[in-house]
């Protein structure tokens, strides 16, 4: 009987680990303090990069926060206003956007009218200058204007349908990055490796031709993308990490070139990412947080850079030790998001939009777990 209950406990722990994959997120404030939300039911401020190697992150959990029980929770920094916008953090109210005022360490809840926007199926970025979310949902580009919000309005905001992209979206599991007020769509079906389709935000215009980022560039495969901030001004570089974690690619939209850095130590297709000016942070499906340093002035330093654990977060919120399919596999999981891009999709996708069966596998896995528990208790 003891062995049976031990197995049941492990199975339940596996389920909780799977839930963690989409329920936590990380972000930076404008002083480049790393904030981790929803780790073990709490929120933490890990401080700036020079403090990550030791000590304990500060507990900043307070009232008004979201429950962090969504399946694809993602965080976005509004640099002009030092606010963190959190999407998909409340399974009971999935359209709500929670606002964390980093200056006052306070939360508020912004209601949102969705219209034709599908909150269960979208990918989004937050534009630096306009403070507008742009999202691709079921083949349509939508926008939501956050204005100058550091706390919620009493009136709801609205998702607005802009137009359909000029490129094909059939079977496309979007990968989106923001740089120079342009949205870069990676891994579009039919596109070559190292290329992207571009939407010019300020002119509301899809460029008719694709953009290339060098001959030794990123692969044509699904992955996660996030932009490197600057102390002031728009982002000019973004990182792309393919789902297999084989490398980290940093793309400069100023020179249309790509650097190749080490891939994360944990190969996790369900991981999410967020970048400051000089660090790229990974949050894995099990809640482990690590980073790699980045120097936009030194290719040599970037080539030599390696990934390290953020120790002061690990000391207060250790990652779960249960291995899951998303924590060790190299495929594409549909139960995931992307920090700085939110991926909420009903199907998974491989290279150039080949649809997979992630949801079916997850559902089957959960059914087997529940069935196993029932048999063990007999």
Residue ranges of each PLM-predicted region?
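N-terminal signal peptide
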Residues: 2, 11-27, 373-378
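Cleavable C-terminal sorting propeptides in eukaryotic secreted/cell-surface proteins
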Residues: 349-378
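Blade-loop segments of beta-propeller domains
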Residues: 54-121
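A short beta-strand motif characteristic of beta-propeller blades
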Residues: 55-67, 106-115, 157-166, 209-218, ...
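Repeated scaffold domains used in trafficking and secretory/extracellular systems
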Residues: 20-28, 64-81, 114-128, 165-175, ...
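Fungal extracellular Ser/Thr-rich, low-complexity intrinsically disordered regions
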Residues: 19-34, 43, 50-52, 209, ...
